[in-house]
């Protein structure tokens, strides 16, 4: 993987990440394809309509079904899904945490029960990498010890101790595998934990920056803290994250979260929000969100957002989308998801343009003024 910083504007950065499968201009938002597909969309939608350069797939779900060996038989995620651009795969630790299916963490990994059939499994720092080697993902995330917020200080301390221990195991294992010819085009990111404790975050960040990870992620946020706590935590930890590597804020978030955290130096984002909200009838626009299922749109022949040039806005009206939603027509999910993801991808593209032009603060002011 190649990484270069193209321009900075304050702490905001416009960078370029080059993997074996695509060139990724940052800031970037990664659509979430939990089970190898972004819900209601296929690879052609992602490539030809949205022009997505990278998407995320979930190790927990793909490990349980269909299984990493089956994915490998098809040539990894790229061959299996026919999305031939970049994939980032998470470690599965967050799903084991969030689904709470008899999950138990110990010093060596995470025990969990499958939400599908109740079978018992154990994720370790090395086993999740073996799974991701089978997937052939371009960016692999290490296993980390995640805690819900607010958290007891003793639990936060244990979390960062385990996360650092697991990070060392993971990077050493990855370097050994590369020497044997495995994972040569695969990159590995460390994950910084520490809750909202600034000293814990600082210690974890400094410890992980000593290791030769290709990039660094901030994990364990958007799990119960306030927006202000999130922003303050990111701002506090950022000076201790190596600026020469990509910075990824995991599982975040709203358009406002993206703008605020780009300002603090984050390069990469992912979240299920645009597709989940789309399926529930909430659509993002340049002037805020609208609820397309509202009766006030029944006779509305205008597009979702007059300023949007997405496939849905160029071809269909609010009234038609309102009808599709009320009729529970599956076509609605595709059209709404295309719009919301287009909004997110163009938001980060517009932010990048503003950074390159040295106008990020002007962009931010305009962004919020349209929502007031």
Swiss-Prot record:
Q: List cofactor names only.
A: Zn(2+)
The free-text cofactor remark is: Binds 1 zinc ion per subunit.
Which positions are annotated as binding substrate?
A: 90-94, 144, 193, 220
Listed EC numbers: 2.4.2.29
User: Which residues are responsible for catalysis?
Assistant: 90, 270
The Gene Ontology terms for molecular function here are: metal ion binding; tRNA-guanosine(34) queuine transglycosylase activity
Recorded hits in SUPFAM superfamilies, A to Z, give: tRNA-guanine transglycosylase
Any one biological process term the GO annotation gives: queuosine biosynthetic process
Q: Where does the record place the region RNA binding?
A: 251-257, 275-279
Task: For this UniProt record, give its keywords in alphabetical order, as a comma-separated list.
Answer: Glycosyltransferase, Metal-binding, Queuosine biosynthesis, Transferase, tRNA processing, Zinc
Which InterPro entries did the record assign? ArchSynthase1/Queuine_TRR (IPR050076), TGT (IPR004803), TGT-like_sf (IPR036511), tRNA_ribo_trans-like (IPR002616)
Question: Which HAMAP family is this protein grouped with?
Answer: Q_tRNA_Tgt (MF_00168)
What does the UniProt function comment say about this protein?
A: Catalyzes the base-exchange of a guanine (G) residue with the queuine precursor 7-aminomethyl-7-deazaguanine (PreQ1) at position 34 (anticodon wobble position) in tRNAs with GU(N) anticodons (tRNA-Asp, -Asn, -His and -Tyr). Catalysis occurs through a double-displacement mechanism. The nucleophile active site attacks the C1' of nucleotide 34 to detach the guanine base from the RNA, forming a covalent enzyme-RNA intermediate. The proton acceptor active site deprotonates the incoming PreQ1, allowing a nucleophilic attack on the C1' of the ribose to form the product.
Name assigned to this protein: Queuine tRNA-ribosyltransferase
Tell me the organism. Answer: Campylobacter hominis (strain ATCC BAA-381 / DSM 21671 / CCUG 45161 / LMG 19568 / NCTC 13146 / CH001A)
Q: What is the lineage of its organism?
A: Bacteria, Pseudomonadati, Campylobacterota, Epsilonproteobacteria, Campylobacterales
């Amino acid at each position: 993987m190649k990484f270069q910083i193209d321009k900075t504007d304050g702490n905001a950065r416009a960078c370029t990440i080059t993997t074996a499968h695509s060139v990724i201009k940052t800031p970037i938002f990664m659509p979430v394809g939990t089970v190898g597909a972004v819900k209601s969309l296929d690879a052609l939608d992602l490539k030809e309509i949205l022009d997505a350069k990278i998407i995320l797939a979930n190790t927990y779900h793909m490990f349980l079904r269909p299984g990493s060996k089956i994915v490998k038989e098809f040539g990894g995620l790229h061959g299996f899904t026919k999305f031939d651009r970049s994939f980032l795969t998470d470690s599965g630790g967050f799903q084991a945490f969030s689904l709470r299916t008899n999950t138990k963490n110990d010093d060596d990994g995470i025990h969990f029960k499958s939400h599908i059939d109740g079978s018992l499994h154990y994720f370790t720092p090395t086993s999740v990498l073996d799974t991701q080697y089978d997937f052939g993902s371009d960016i692999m995330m290490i296993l980390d010890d995640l805690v819900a917020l607010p958290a007891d200080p003793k639990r936060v301390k244990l979390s960062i101790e385990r996360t650092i221990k697991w990070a060392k195991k993971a990077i050493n294992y990855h370097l050994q595998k590369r020497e044997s010819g495995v994972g040569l085009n695969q990159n590995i990111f460390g994950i910084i934990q520490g809750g909202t404790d600034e000293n814990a975050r600082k210690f974890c960040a400094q410890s992980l920056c000593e290791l030769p990870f290709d990039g660094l992620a901030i994990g364990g946020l958007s799990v119960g803290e306030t927006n202000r706590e999130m922003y303050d935590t990111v701002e506090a930890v950022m000076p201790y994250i190596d600026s020469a590597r990509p910075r990824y804020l995991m599982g975040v978030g709203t358009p406002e979260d993206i703008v605020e955290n780009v300002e603090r130096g984050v390069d990469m984002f992912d979240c299920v929000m645009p597709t989940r909200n789309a399926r529930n009838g909430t659509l993002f626009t340049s002037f805020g969100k609208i609820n397309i299922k509202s009766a006030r749109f029944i006779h509305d022949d205008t597009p979702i957002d007059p300023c949007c040039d997405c496939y849905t806005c160029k071809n269909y009206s609010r009234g038609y989308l309102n009808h599709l939603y009320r009729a529970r027509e599956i076509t609605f999910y595709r059209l709404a998801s295309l719009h919301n993801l287009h909004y997110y991808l163009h938001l980060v593209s517009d932010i990048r343009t503003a950074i390159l032009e040295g106008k990020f603060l002007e962009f931010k002011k305009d962004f919020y003024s349209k929502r007031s």
